[in-house]
Amino acid sequence: MSPPRDRVDAYYKDNFQFKNTRVVLNKEQLLIERPCMLLTVLFVMFLSLVGLLAIAGIRLHRAAVNTAKINNDLTTSIDITKSIEYQVKDVLTPLFKIIGDEVGLRTPQRFTDLTKFISDKIKFLNPDKEYDFRDINWCINPPERIKIDYDQYCAHTAAEDLITMLVNSSLTGTTVPRTSLVNLGRNCTGPTTTKGQFSNISLTLSGIYSGRGYNISSMITITGKGMYGSTYLVGKYNQRARRPSKVWHQDYRVFEVGIIRELGVGTPGFHMTNYLELPRQPELETCMLALGESKLAALCLADSPVALHYGRVGDDNKIRFVKLGVWASPADRDTLATLSAIDPTLDGLYITTHRGIIAAGTAIWAVPVTRTDDQVKMGKCRLEACRDRPPPFCNSTDWEPLEAGRIPAYGVLTIKLGLADEPKVDIISEFGPLITHDSGMDLYTSFDGTKYWLTTPPLQNSALGTVNTLVLEPSLKISPNILTLPIRSGGGDCYIPTYLSDRADDDVKLSSNLVILPSRDLQYVSATYDISRVEHAIVYHIYSTGRLSSYYYPFKLPIKGDPVSLQIECFPWDRKLWCHHFCSVVDSGTGEQVTHIGVVGIKITCNGK
């Protein structure tokens, strides 16, 4: 084996070498040529770099241009998509719905109406029974070639619809936001302060007559849902007469109806919009009112009991029926009404000043009546009520039925107010808590609308007023609610009003009617004429059965004397309770009868600790 050196220096046929060859380098030449080569290489590299940068810039520019173009295309596509969405959602969808309604609902209905019209016309031309030409459909589609005098009825119907629309628009703008449920002192857990505010600003005919010095008497005022109605007697005389022989005097019965609105002074005011003035007649002596559904209804008759006969009524018993819309129209009525006594047990009707309601096109009132079966059904109740320490009504001679030993029942009078309805008064009756005086009965609708509140006013220094419930369906029923006492030995349904002790308050000279307030819990107001102060006052008493609380506010009167009548009506307005009063007094100095009319606002605030 040869040594390594020999292996290194060995000759291989694949390595072409010249043995013993000597290479001589020219160092000077290398020193000159090397920088030039380096510069050339660097220049070439620089040019390559510039070229690469140029290529990159061109590509970047193209990419930016393409990106901008793509963004524009995307924006355009989005706009087109939104436009398509708008067309589908806001144009095509309602259009499809309209087409669907037309095809699926209206077209069949039109075919049905057309079929009905053809059928009605055939029936009209070939009637099998007497046709009612007062059908409102003939106002819309009158028959051809048939002469029918239907213009007046159609005009009345259109007038009532227009009045309803006007009333609703007026109440929406002026009264409805201000009227609400009464909830006086709801957050008070301790002492309270009651403050009052008086206002006599109004736009009523009674205000004009009072300003002229005319004598106003027997005023009744009722309110409801932003409306008011009233009736009264007024005596007019010629103020310009120079000689006493030329002075004339004429009495009238006046009916007013209107809305309650803000008159610019921060207090509610009555704004009369329609009225009726009739010369005083015997059948207009006593009137009872009902308000609702944009109209006022009244029944009036002579100041005497009405004798009822089964199936008919006497010719001498004239009942006047008046209907006024909040705005005057041809639908207003003033006519005589017939009394339908369909109950053979009814034999007497006793009407005083009563407040009714209007519901479902019908006016409703509650009044005392007498029945031939009173002793059979209520004789034991009266006997037990008068056994120990009999109340004053047991021996009363102030009211005809009590003096005759009769036991009055509750009668409900109804009259339909539709244009096609005849002015006929229907009567139904039923017994309930004993009726002990004839100071009137008032009806109010309860909060839930399932029943009515029936109130009787207090009897001066004798008995408290009562609040009963009245239900019409399925049959008439009157049940006690508050301020009545049960007579245990008198049977299951034997109740009498709460009578006061023998120690009467001599300072209380007169009591008013009892007013139910619109509230969830039963709240009511009554007033008394009080002479305990230097200035005589109307004292308002406010009761809340839900919280077992009561409040009072004395309103000082500018007049003084012996009271003749006191009538109030209350309604909520701007978080206050406002009560309208009509007070008639025989003046202590002159002996003449004077009146005071106005509205008192009552606000109850909590006293801070």
From Swiss-Prot:
Gene3D superfamilies: 2.120.10.10. Keywords: Glycoprotein, Hemagglutinin, Host membrane, Host-virus interaction, Membrane, Signal-anchor, Transmembrane, Transmembrane helix, Viral attachment to host cell, Viral envelope protein, Virion, Virus entry into host cell. Glycans are attached at N168, N187, N200, N215, N395. Its main location: virion. One of its GO terms (cellular component) is virion membrane. GO terms for biological process: symbiont entry into host cell; virion attachment to host cell. Residues 59-609 are virion surface. Pfam families: HN. GO terms for molecular function: host cell surface receptor binding. It is a single-pass type II membrane protein. It is found in: Virion membrane; Host membrane. The chain crosses the membrane at residues 35-58. SUPFAM superfamilies: Sialidases. Residues 1-34 are intravirion. Belongs to the paramyxoviruses hemagglutinin-neuraminidase family. Non-sialidase subfamily. Attaches the virus to cell receptors and thereby initiating infection. Binding of H protein to the receptor induces a conformational change that allows the F protein to trigger virion/cell membranes fusion. Down-regulates human MCP/CD46 cell surface expression. This is Hemagglutinin glycoprotein.
